[in-house]
C-alpha cells in the first residue's frame, strides 16, 4: 500500500500525522467491524482518504458540517481532521446508526485529537440539524440524499455528494422529485466519478 507524504496531499505535517493515526486505526478496527471492504483497505489512501480530502477542498465556509452515514469516517472524519487546522471555526457532526461504527468514530476522533460530535441515530429520526454543509458518501441514491438535504441543510447551505459513473442517471431520476442547482466536479481518484455540489433543494 502506497502512503503519500504531506506535500503530496497539500497538508501540514501535523495534519498528516493525524491522517496516519486515523489510517492505522482503520486497519486495526476493520477486521472486527468491516469499516471498508478488504480489497479497498489495500488502497486506503487513494480510495478513501484522498477521495475524502477532495470533498473538503471543494467545501465552502460554514459553521456546521454534518456528515450522514459516516461509517468508517469517510468523508466526515477526514474533513474534520483537515478542518482542525484549516477551518477551526467549523463544527462537525457525524451521524452513524451502527453502534460499533459510532464507537470507532468516537475513538478515532479522540486519538486524532479532534472535536467531532457523533450521533448514533437513524437519519430519519433526527430533528433538523440546520447544517451549512452536508456530506454523504456511498449512503443512498441522489433522490434519497436530497430528501435528507431538504430536512437537514440550512437554506443557503451546500450539499457535497461524491457519486460514481452513473451520476448523470441519478441526476435525471432526482430531478423528477426535486428542484436543485448543481456543479459536477470531476473526481481526482476516479475519472468517471464526480463530486456533486448541490444548493437550493426544494420539492417539485
UniProtKB/Swiss-Prot annotation:
Binding residues for S-adenosyl-L-methionine: 69, 74, 123-124, 137
Which ranges of the sequence are coiled-coil? none
Q: Which Pfam families match?
A: GidB
Report the domain of life of the source organism.
Answer: Bacteria
Task: Report the EC code(s) recorded for this entry.
Answer: 2.1.1.170
Keywords, alphabetical: Cytoplasm, Methyltransferase, rRNA processing, S-adenosyl-L-methionine, Transferase
Per the entry, what this protein does is: Specifically methylates the N7 position of guanine in position 527 of 16S rRNA.
Q: What is this protein called?
A: Ribosomal RNA small subunit methyltransferase G
Amino acid at each position: 500500500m502506497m502512503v503519500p507524504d504531506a506535500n503530496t496531499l497539500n497538508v501540514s505535517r501535523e495534519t498528516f500525522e493525524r491522517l496516519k493515526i486515523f489510517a492505522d486505526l482503520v486497519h486495526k478496527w476493520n477486521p472486527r467491524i468491516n469499516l471498508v471492504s478488504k480489497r479497498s483497505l489495500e488502497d486506503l489512501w487513494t480510495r478513501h482518504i484522498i477521495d475524502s480530502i477532495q470533498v473538503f477542498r471543494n467545501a465552502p465556509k460554514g459553521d456546521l458540517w454534518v456528515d450522514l452515514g459516516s461509517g468508517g469516517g469517510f468523508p466526515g472524519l477526514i474533513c474534520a481532521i483537515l478542518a482542525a487546522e484549516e477551518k477551526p471555526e467549523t463544527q462537525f457532526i457525524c451521524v452513524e446508526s451502527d453502534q460499533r461504527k459510532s464507537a470507532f468514530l468516537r475513538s478515532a476522533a479522540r486519538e486524532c485529537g479532534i472535536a467531532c460530535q457523533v450521533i448514533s441515530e437513524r437519519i430519519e429520526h433526527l430533528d433538523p440539524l440546520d447544517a451549512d454543509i452536508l456530506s454523504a458518501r456511498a449512503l443512498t441514491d441522489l433522490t434519497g440524499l436530497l430528501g435528507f438535504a431538504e430536512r437537514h441543510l440550512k437554506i443557503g447551505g451546500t450539499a457535497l455528494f461524491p457519486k460514481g459513473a452513473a451520476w448523470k442517471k441519478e441526476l435525471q431520476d432526482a430531478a423528477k422529485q426535486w428542484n436543485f442547482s448543481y456543479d459536477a466536479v470531476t473526481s481526482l481518484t476516479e475519472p468517471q466519478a464526480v463530486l456533486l455540489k448541490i444548493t437550493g433543494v426544494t420539492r417539485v
